[in-house]
Amino acid sequence: MNVSQSAFVTREKITLKCVGIVTKPDSPEAAQFSKQLSCWLHDRDIATGINDIEEHMDLIIALGGDGTLLHIAELATKYSIPVLGVNFGSLGFLAEVNKDDTFESIEKIIAEETIIENRQMIRSRVLSKNSSSGYRFALNEVVITKNALDRLLHLSTKVNDQLLTDYRADGLIFSTPTGSTAYNLSAGGPLVYPGLATILVTPICPFMLSSRPLILPAEKLIKTKFKARDNKEAAQVLVDGQSLWKMHNGDELEIETAGHALKLIVSDSHNYFSILRNKLHWGVEDKRDK
């Protein structure tokens, strides 16, 4: 797979003729705001589509948290449509625009060049003895995991057809730098600056304490073979939190960097390290200790 060498940060003049608005499910606030936003755009002769992503759209506005943005990342990347995340959730690593700043942010997009961070995506598929699944794309991570009551998984993992190791663990997380602040971090993996081209491999509760997270170059092809103890044992594969496939004995999960990146719109004042401090409470004294 040829890894795209495009710059992490680019500037682009976006002409808005049609905008897709995607709302957080079961959020009356986001649904109501989408109507207000749609009217505002119509007043400026800009067509809109609600909760529908089409190839001809010039911009997608995700009204929700990071989960909403993850939900639309695959299609947005496929059609190379820039995404603006408006935070209606709680964390907001990716959806950094506040609701009250939405209209001002769109006016800047209309009037000026837009700053875009090209966020690396990874793609995955499951290879069985006589077939293979189609590719699916992730902005955060692909996870192979066991069922709650099952024993540890035996996962024989290769990098560019060279044996890495045989993991015995509850599962493995294959993460992008963007996803390093998500499940990877909870499992003890490292934080990685989103502009670096890497794939992170992080074991989940490994049997051997010497099994540690690993950072690989983005151009590496990773294959993990599931070695089940019997025909009843199975593993689950989740792509950005969505359960997609079940793996059986001898099946392989293939992971590699996707050929295209997600175009994530950021503000002039965007500061990755400030986001880490604020969201992870770095250097903030815990008032509960007083």
Swiss-Prot record:
GO terms for molecular function: ATP binding; metal ion binding; NAD binding; NAD+ kinase activity. One of its GO terms (cellular component) is cytoplasm. Belongs to the NAD kinase family. It is found in: Cytoplasm. Involved in the regulation of the intracellular balance of NAD and NADP, and is a key enzyme in the biosynthesis of NADP. Catalyzes specifically the phosphorylation on 2'-hydroxyl of the adenosine moiety of NAD to yield NADP. The gene is nadK. InterPro entries: ATP-NAD_kinase_N, ATP-NAD_kinase_PpnK-typ_C, NAD/diacylglycerol_kinase_sf, NADK. The lineage of its organism: Bacteria, Pseudomonadati, Thermodesulfobacteriota, Desulfobulbia, Desulfobulbales. The keyword Transcription regulation does not apply. PANTHER family: NAD KINASE (PTHR20275:SF0). This is NAD kinase. It is an enzyme of class 2 (transferase). Its EC number is 2.7.1.23.
